[in-house]
Amino acid sequence: MTRYFCTYFDRNYLTRGLALYRSLRQACPSFDLWVLCLDTVCYRVLLQLQLPGMHLIPLEELEQNDRQLCAAKGNRSLLEYYFTCSPCLPTFVLNHHVYVDRITYLDADLYFFRDPSDLFDEIEHSSIAIIPHRFHPTFLDREQFGIYNVGWVSFRRDESGMACLSKWREQCLDWCY
């Protein structure tokens, strides 16, 4: 079964993004990875590499397809803007690729040491998969930044999954700084 992932990075995270890709190549039998290239250097390097299963999305393409995202660019820092892209990217993939039944957003600095099939088996009937931070009591003050880690977030193309993704996108567009 083909797994569908998306991530984003710029030239500063290019090596991490490539490590994520290579770990997927070794651990996941069949996958597609959409990469939102946050700068032209990243896009050009990945375009030259022509990696199988990797699909490139220049930032400009996402912005042209999401006017609300583009409008948000003017009221936040570059890093905050990148974070705002987190729900917009899986939305874009689902809107443009109707065969994708579940999209999983991954932070670019993740690395797979084994096949993620067990994880997908566990969430097989779930519309949404999200991981709580599970802060150690010493770090509970960090809950002010959120109780969930968005490093791995998965959405099924069904009513609940799409509604949750849409709500997350709206909330990030309203406030992500």
Descriptions of predicted regions:
Residues 1-177:
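Glycosyltransferase catalytic domains, chiefly GT-A lineage
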